[in-house]
Amino acid sequence: MIYGGKMKRNLIILFFNSFLFFNLLYSQESLNIPITPSDDQQLDNAVGFSRTLNSFNKSANSYAKLKAYINLLDSKGMKALKKHPSYSRLGDIYMYGAMYLEKEYKENKIIELYKKALELRAEPNSNYSLAIIYKNRYDIAVKKKDAVKEVEYGKMVYEYLNKYVILSRNKSAKYKKILNYFSSYK
């Protein structure tokens, strides 16, 4: 009986401690996991900035910072970016740049930003966005009866939508039907 009481007490203490630990862990406003520092302090700062992008406040200052970091990444070159230990976070800057600066930049610049994001990280939403952009271009080419552009854009729609379906594991019949239609362009 005494042994059973000690075990019961220990289980209660263990449960209480784990409850406190998980409560403390999940009550943090922003749980920041430290980045692995590199030789390039500017890129480390860019990684820190990328962690704030999911709560982008759309102020003029935020847009200016985003543009400045995109220019910084462009000046470093893709080879240097890929050497950084947190290079996928650098891809976030390109991805969010494409999303938030869509009204400011021309479509070709948005495409370039999404492609750079994909070069640094495999992410389904950028593939989907590119598929939509190329689908719109495809529709315009069909209306203008430009067969060369139709084939070019049809191929791109298939490529990016297929990557989206694979990465997102989306098994929707809608996407299968669209992929089947554009498969003739691959």
Tell where the protein language model's regions lie, with residue ranges.
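TPR/TPR-like (Sel1-like) alpha-helical repeat modules
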Residues: 145-170
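Short helix-capping/linker turns of helical repeat alpha-solenoids
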Residues: 82-83, 87, 121-123
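N-terminal leader/linker segments that initiate helical-solenoid repeat arrays
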Residues: 27-71
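Single-residue signature of alpha-solenoid repeat helices
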Residues: 59-65, 110, 150, 157
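Classical Sec-dependent N-terminal signal peptides that target proteins to the secretory pathway
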Residues: 1-29
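Alpha-solenoid helical repeat scaffolds
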Residues: 88, 92-95, 125-129, 176-177
